[in-house]
């Protein structure tokens, strides 16, 4: 099992380093790469007769979720950890709007290739005029840019990538709050839109997701007393 994970990590590192360096305009056509291993985790997943069925299904599961953050954005609520007040950190997020069936069916899975038991492909989605207007609205207004990294187990598949995205967004919001808000708030809520294609790789046997956002702060609730 350990050798399989090491092999997967090395393969993904070689594949995705050149992809991370690319700078592609996202205004009209959203384009980013996704991958899924053709191998299964014993005791967690059941083998299938078609070795491509599982990775294809995984890629199609995660694509609409990521695209929702690039096309419509995500909303979030963040309660910072406060040891003195006995407040635990809480972070929740959800899509502002999910892709509908027609939009999901218009997603293109382009130029697939297999390398070292990993199925790779480019995800392409053409924005409508209304969606371009949304993107330009975020781009033209002086929204701060934030960035975060998140991690999750490779064996968790779609849930792992979703959890890593959640952590990446939380870290981006947390870093912004610590840098720009002088007094620790009780709660922050707002919305974000991905400003760059997501970077999904591996680090130490885990998914590593790096996300860049435009951010809009909708509400900051302050503590009235200590």
Regions from the PLM with identified roles:
Residues 20-226:
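Domain-level marker for long, solvent-exposed, non-transmembrane regions
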Residues 1-9:
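Bacterial N-terminal signal peptides that target proteins for export
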Residues 13-21:
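Hydrophobic h-region of N-terminal signal peptides that target proteins for export
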């Amino acid at each position: 099992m350990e050798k399989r994970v090491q092999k997967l990590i090395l393969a993904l590192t070689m594949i995705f380093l050149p992809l991370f360096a690319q700078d592609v305009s996202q205004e009209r056509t959203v384009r980013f790469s996704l991958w899924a291993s053709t191998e299964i985790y014993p005791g967690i997943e059941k083998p299938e007769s078609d070795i491509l069925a599982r990775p294809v299904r995984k890629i199609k599961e995660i694509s609409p979720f990521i695209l929702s953050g690039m096309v419509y954005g995500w909303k979030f609520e963040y309660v910072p950890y406060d040891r003195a007040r006995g407040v635990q950190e809480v972070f929740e997020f959800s899509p502002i709007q999910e892709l509908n069936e027609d939009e999901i069916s218009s997603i293109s899975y382009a130029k697939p290739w297999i390398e070292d038991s990993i199925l790779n492909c480019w995800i392409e989605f053409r924005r409508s005029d209304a969606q371009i207007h949304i993107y330009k609205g975020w781009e033209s207004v002086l929204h701060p840019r934030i960035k975060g990294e998140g991690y999750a187990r490779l064996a968790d598949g779609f849930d792992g990538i979703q959890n890593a995205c959640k952590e990446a967004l939380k870290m981006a919001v947390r870093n912004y709050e610590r840098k720009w808000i002088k007094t620790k708030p009780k709660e922050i809520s707002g919305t974000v839109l991905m400003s760059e294609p997501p970077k999904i790789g591996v680090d130490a046997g885990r998914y590593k997701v790096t996300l860049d956002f435009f951010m809009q702060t909708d509400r900051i609730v302050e503590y009235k007393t200590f």
